[in-house]
């Protein structure tokens, strides 16, 4: 199977520029376009907390967030709009945050819009980075399920 052909076809299906940027950043963080990344990591990802290469440690996820903040925020805004919610309310509803009294609306807003501060917001940054991984993985899984694998043979 030609994995680059698989990835290129998936990207071509997604005409949303910010999603494409986020997807490419996620795949790069996972290790690049190869069979392990695409078929094992993206296809099998159900929960980003399960420990995927590049998304295990706060230092990795905070750096990923800082480098890709604008495209992740843009994608989160689009999802919030789809849900008919404002961005911060949607984020507060994430499983990691909804029952955590320490994660306030103000803390989320600060993590989104204040200057990067890994020490103060690392847990929130970690969740934002893992949101990106799960969003890309979910879209890839849905797309891959509809594909005829023989189209991607060498």
What are these regions, as identified by a protein language model?
Residues 25-152:
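Acidic, low-complexity, intrinsically disordered interaction modules
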Residues 1-21, 145-146:
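Short, extreme N-terminal segment that most often corresponds to the first beta-strand
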Residues 6, 152-154:
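N-terminal targeting leader peptides, primarily classical Sec-type signal peptides for secretion
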């Amino acid at each position: 199977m030609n994995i680059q052909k698989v990835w290129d076809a998936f990207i071509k299906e997604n005409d949303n520029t910010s999603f494409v940027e986020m997807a490419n950043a996620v795949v790069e963080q996972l290790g690049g376009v190869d069979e392990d990344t695409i078929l094992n990591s993206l296809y099998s990802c159900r929960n980003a907390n399960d420990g995927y290469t590049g998304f295990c440690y706060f230092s990795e996820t905070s750096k990923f967030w800082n480098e890709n903040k604008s495209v992740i925020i843009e994608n989160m805004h689009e999802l919030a709009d789809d849900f008919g919610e404002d961005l911060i309310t949607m984020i507060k509803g994430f499983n990691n945050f909804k029952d955590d009294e320490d994660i306030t609306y103000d803390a989320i807003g600060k993590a989104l819009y204040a200057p990067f501060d890994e020490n103060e917001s690392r847990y929130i940054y970690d969740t934002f980075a893992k949101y990106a991984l799960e969003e890309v993985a979910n879209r890839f899984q849905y797309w891959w399920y509809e594909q005829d694998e023989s189209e991607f043979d060498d």
